């Protein structure tokens, strides 16, 4: 368990060394699209073949550094039409439309050897693209919120912390005043991810000034539009980043309870969020007296029932309360009387923080 900032930094450095000792990494996309295409079968098949070949294999980041090949189930790479996807590091090779029968060749050429399987690379206009970053689909993208998706084990808190995770929470707790946090979010220009585009900093400011003792932070992960998978990709691919953003919102506003409202039709997102919350609680990063700061924060998941209208704020809070998900007349707004009639920060943009 991590009790304070010193232990958080020690944990980070320890597992960072373990990551650096892994001389090759196999990242198999475990987003919903690739899983539907059989990516988990590919993961198990290639891992089995590698073990049978007598090569050192790990599926979990160990405390002590070991030279080994790491097998990881990553979040969504975003290139779903070409799935199942598999990435080999440190080379950055991305294999597309991989099948279980391709695993023998991947083992021989890319794991035992140091060359790509050219037929599995992405091809366009007669050219093969070895590095993922050079593929036209990715080349002009600058990933900010999705920076970890496709590059890390979505379920490993050790890897998240090793890459700097929960350092922002430590900074908010010990190096910043609550007003400074709110002002920084306002200065960033961050807005909601829905159609209204309401400034996130103003929501934090309005909830922070409320005199109520009990306040809430609610993440709206309910996207009802057919074919809209923005929220799902974030929750599946980098759940700890969502948790950390909600915690910072809690620090800024004086809220100690959070809810993630997620569609029940996203079972993988629900599973990964549950795993992430349990891991954070086990390490002492959720619960009472986080990092010996005196700040408490708990987080719960509420699964929606598929109602499109529950994407609207007041309908969403009604659904969490166990009532029929119906919008109410405003004012009062959720920042004044939201969940259980208490001031509530309701947003998905908190993950950007």
Predicted regions: what they are:
Residues 1-351:
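Feature of Fe-S/electron-transfer and energy-metabolism proteins
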